[in-house]
């Protein structure tokens, strides 16, 4: 089984550059605007899209992403509408990988089999489910793999050598290294330690390693890019969108343009870093 994620990372490896993985919240601040953001991301330089599934109790998310989820839910966003976004995106873009990211409760209520069927039909390539450990692979991970959808695991600085093989077992697509403990949007980790961690994980897997949590600026993204196969940016993009909204969460500026400007700057920085390192 070769997915769009596999194809994308193979292409990037051949080009000698890391991926820019961009996260935003589905339905934030509303369905129409969020879909415009999603369609604009690849044109701005995003290589992989992480599509957030808004949830009322997002335990791993910091204030910015929690607020984005709340705005989306208040605007009527549902899991079905988030899948609709993926399907609409696929009508114009059949190559950029889509990874849906969120919490298991949403999928469980929707129905695992129904969700996987609809996700595959909508053009979803991978899942990141932050509250589903490897001990529960039978719940979603293995069915997802059988459906042709990558299941992407999170590793952290506290994932020790005993735990790492369990985390990597049944992982596919890429490995998401959370560069610090805590919630999304925290301060960036020491890049030297990140590099050491990535090298350590690579001893146990051939999968690409993408690093996220705390990456906010093009300079930070470039620093991480020297050590990883991909850089994940989420909170900064969510904040760029939020900066164009009024106190009620309605657009007062141009959220799409704000997100696009940031992603373009991030993409230029990430690509230039690896090119300089390769010369």
From Swiss-Prot:
It catalyses: (1S,2R)-1-C-(indol-3-yl)glycerol 3-phosphate + L-serine = D-glyceraldehyde 3-phosphate + L-tryptophan + H2O. SUPFAM superfamilies: Ribulose-phoshate binding barrel (SSF51366). Keywords: Amino-acid biosynthesis, Aromatic amino acid biosynthesis, Lyase, Tryptophan biosynthesis. It is an enzyme of class 4 (lyase). Pfam families: Trp_syntA. The active site is at 50 (proton acceptor), 61 (proton acceptor). It comes from the Bacteria. Gene3D superfamilies: Aldolase class I. InterPro entries: Aldolase_TIM (IPR013785), RibuloseP-bd_barrel (IPR011060), Trp_synthase_alpha_AS (IPR018204), Trp_synthase_suA (IPR002028). CDD domains: Tryptophan_synthase_alpha. Pathway: Amino-acid biosynthesis; L-tryptophan biosynthesis; L-tryptophan from chorismate: step 5/5. GO terms for cellular component: cytosol. Transmembrane segments: none annotated. Its EC number is 4.2.1.20. HAMAP family: Trp_synth_alpha (MF_00131). The alpha subunit is responsible for the aldol cleavage of indoleglycerol phosphate to indole and glyceraldehyde 3-phosphate. Belongs to the TrpA family. Tetramer of two alpha and two beta chains. This is Tryptophan synthase alpha chain. It comes from Brucella melitensis biotype 1 (strain ATCC 23456 / CCUG 17765 / NCTC 10094 / 16M). The lineage of its organism: Bacteria, Pseudomonadati, Pseudomonadota, Alphaproteobacteria, Hyphomicrobiales.
